[in-house]
């Protein structure tokens, strides 16, 4: 059975379509179809109803939508009052502070102890009260005079000197000597070969 789509509805083309519209039907036995002619009492194929009105969609109740609109119009929304009741920027700051506190207590101050930062450190700004075993080594600043002396004699070194810190003294020295050679670069002009 062939079908066509017209304005969102599905129309089935068959021999009974003309009878439903009130037009003359083709005489029995003279049509192109091999089907039997419909009976006059309605027991044949002509009494069958079309299926185009069956849909899977539920129909909306117009009264229900109008009552919800009235409820929405009746309520006044005060955006300033809503903003006063809940300040979202404070929530974000608090979440970030909690994340920093957990990272700070886990990795920096307590280093593996299962205590909260608020329990381990009474005040956040008072870091000097922390035990020496839980704090990192302090770095010493090298005066500029000593630093320039190290740079002047660096070309004579065969390997890097041992650092003052105990962390770097365990590293193996380089087997190759350090060479500080000056390198000069020259720009070549492209030759036009065409």
From Swiss-Prot:
Motif DEN-box in this chain: 14-16
Motif (D-box): 48-50
Regions of compositional bias (Low complexity) in chain numbering: 28-40
Listed InterPro entries: Patronus
Induction trigger: Constitutive expression with no clear cell-cycle regulation.
GO biological process, one term: regulation of mitotic cell cycle
Disruption phenotype: No visible phenotype and no meiotic or pollen development defects. Pans1 and pans2 double mutants are lethal when homozygous.
Tissues in which the protein is found: Expressed in somatic and reproductive tissues.
Biological role: Not required for protection of centromeric cohesion.
Protein name: Protein PATRONUS 2
């Amino acid at each position: 059975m062939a079908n066509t789509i017209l304005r969102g509805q599905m129309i089935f083309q068959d021999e009974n379509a003309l009878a439903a519209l009130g037009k003359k039907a083709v005489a029995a036995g003279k049509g192109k179809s091999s089907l039997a002619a419909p009976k006059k009492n309605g027991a044949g194929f002509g009494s069958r109803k079309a299926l185009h009105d069956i849909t899977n969609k539920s129909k909306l109740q117009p009264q229900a939508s109008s009552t919800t609109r009235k409820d929405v119009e009746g309520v006044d929304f005060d955006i300033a009052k809503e903003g006063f009741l809940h300040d979202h920027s404070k929530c974000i700051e608090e979440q970030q502070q909690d994340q920093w506190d957990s990272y700070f207590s886990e990795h920096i101050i307590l280093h593996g102890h299962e205590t909260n930062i608020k329990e381990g450190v009474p005040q956040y700004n008072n870091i000097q009260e922390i035990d020496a075993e839980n704090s990192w080594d302090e770095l010493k600043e090298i005066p500029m005079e000593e630093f320039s002396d190290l740079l002047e004699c660096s070309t004579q070194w065969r390997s890097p000197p041992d650092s003052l810190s105990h962390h770097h003294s365990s590293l193996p020295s380089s087997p190759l000597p350090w060479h500080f050679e000056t390198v000069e670069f020259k720009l070549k002009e492209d030759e036009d070969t065409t």
